[in-house]
Each structure stands twice: as C-alpha cells, then as structure tokens.
Curated annotation (Swiss-Prot):
Protein name per the record: Small ribosomal subunit protein uS2
GO MF annotations in UniProt: structural constituent of ribosome
Organism whose genome encodes this protein: Corynebacterium glutamicum (strain ATCC 13032 / DSM 20300 / JCM 1318 / BCRC 11384 / CCUG 27702 / LMG 3730 / NBRC 12168 / NCIMB 10025 / NRRL B-2784 / 534)
Coiled-coil spans in chain: none
Listed HAMAP family: Ribosomal_uS2_B
UniProt biased composition (Basic and acidic residues): 224-233
Composition bias, Acidic residues: 256-272
Pfam family, one: Ribosomal_S2
Record GO biological process: translation
Domain of life of the source: Bacteria
TM region(s), chain numbering: none
Family affiliation: Belongs to the universal ribosomal protein uS2 family.
Amino acid sequence: MAVVTMRELLDAGVHFGHQTRRWNPKMRRFIFTERNGIYIIDLQQTLTYIDQAFEFVKETVAHGGTVLFVGTKKQAQEAVQVEADRVGMPYVNHRWLGGMLTNFQTVSKRLNRMKELQAMDAAENGYEGRTKREVLMLTRERTKLERVLGGIAEMTRVPSALWIIDTNKEHIAVAEAHKLNIPVVAILDTNCDPDVVDFPVPGNDDAIRSTALLSRVISTAVEEGKKAREERQLAAAKDAAGDAKPEAEEAPAAAEAEEAPAAEAEEAPAAE
C-alpha cells in the first residue's frame, strides 16, 4: 500500500511552489512547470522521495533512534506538535535556541530547571515562604521555558534525525545537524537549497494542509519503526528463551546418566 497517494498530495496543495521570482535555481530538477507566475512541483518525484524518506525514518526508529520534529513557522506549529505527540517524539515548534544540538549539555540544564519549577508549581506548598512578586517571576520563568523547551522535555540526548519544515527559516537547526552529522529530512519548497538536506521531500512548506499531510507521513514512518522494533525485541526474547530451554532439559538428563552407573554398582552382587 502506498504511503500517500497522488490525489492526497494534490488535495493538500503540495504541488504549489513559490512565485517564479522567488526560487532557488538548484530546485530546477524538482519543478514540473510554471503556471500563472507560480512554480508547480513535480509530484511524481515527490512520491519517490517520500518513499525514501519514509524508509529511512522507519529504519532509524526501528534501530532505537529518535526523530526531532522542527517547524516554528505559524503554518507548521500545530502539525509538528500533533504528529510528534502522536508517536512520542520530541519537537520544537516555537523558537529554535542556538546550541540546542551543538550545546545540548547546557540545554539539559535548562530542562532540569524547567522540571524543577514544574515540580514546585505542582507541590501543595511549593511556593511557601515566597512573596507574590517572587511567585510571579518564577511562574513567568516556567512558562517561558515550557514554551521553548516543552517539546523536548523528555529528550536525554541529541536525536538520530531531524524532520524540518522550511529549511530556510530553520537554517540554524540545519547547520547544527550538519555539524553533528545528524541526517536531515525536510520539505523542499522551490526557494530552498536541496544541498543541505539528506532526505528531501519536494513540496509546499507554506500551506497548513501540506505541512500537516507530510508531517503525518513522517509520524507514520515513526509508528511503523516502533512496531518493527517491538517485533525484533519479541523475536530476540523468544530466541533467547528457546536457547535456554534445551539447556534446562539437558541438565536433568545428564544427572540421570551420572546416577545410573552408581545405582548399577550398588545392585551388583559382591564377588566371593
């Protein structure tokens, strides 16, 4: 079964690129035609690249990897959060903090601070002994941290791959990923640079329906990867149990074999 159909791509407007005056010549090979001053993306190629991106994400997750969903532009914020939450993956949908990948140790400290403030807020007497002004300042700090870091609260290490909507806007995230050799999977609109992406998905990165559909494809790949990982773990557990069973059966048999000669010796009549 196809990951996504041509009809779904058309209905979501994935084929609409930018105005012809706003384009990156490197994207020429992904463009089908021009219509009314707008570039039309070749969806046949999009389908092929979607399959490649899907398999990569699926295998990455199947081998224990994580995928960080990134999209801070208004059209992408909801899709990024919804799809990442759906499959238990981290996300950034408000602001990319410089060093979020390359200086993850410092970011981890901010995550710990956020959790500390959340615990304080949840406790019955968490703010006991503090003035109203102090409580207000702590609340503001917690809210700010949750807005920026809430999506990566459970991220304990840098991700295995990034899913990015609008590589131009998220150029810092792309640069950090490259510095750490983290593969980038991204939507490539006609104004993007395909050279900075490892697994491109040619398409519209401005329409809400387009970003939602393509993010759904990636989250489904994550879902499939998790299933594959669980199946591998179950198979490994069964194999381990199967190897242990013959050993357990051999032990009593060996003991019986050792006891038999001794019993025969006891039963034999004494020589006169």
